Amino acid sequence: MDAKARILVVDDEKGMCEFLHYLLEGEGYEVEEAHSGAEALDKIHQAPFQLVLADIKMPGIDGLEMLRRIREANQDTVVIVMTGYSSLETAIKAIKYDASDYLTKPFDDPDAVLAAVERGLADRQEEAGR
C-alpha cells in the first residue's frame, strides 16, 4: 500500500466526505476534501493527487465531467467514481473516460472502498514503472 498517497475525496454530501476522509486517513493516506467538481479541479491544479475518489452526481461540474477534464489535461491521477444512481450509461461513460473503478453507494463494506483504492494505486505504480 502506498501509505503516503495524496487522495482527494469529492462529494457534495459532506457526511460522505467525512466518512471517506476518516476511513482513508485511518489507513495512513493524506486526504483532502472537495464538495464540488469545480472545487476539486481547483485543488487538482494547485497540487497533484495520486488518487481522486469522486461522486458522479453533483451540481455544476459532475464527477464524469471532472474525470473528462482530468484526462484532457493528461493527468495520470487515478480516478474512482462512485454513485448512488447506478446505470449502464454512467458506467460506460466512466469506462470511456478511464475511471479506475466504479463503486455504488451506499457502501455495504468499507473494505471494498479500501480495496479499490489500493488496486488503483498499485495499477498506477505499475504503469509508472513501465
Tell me the role of every PLM-derived stretch.
Residues 54-55, 66:
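Active-site T/S-Asp motif of two-component receiver
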Residues 112-124:
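Receiver (REC) domain switch/output surface
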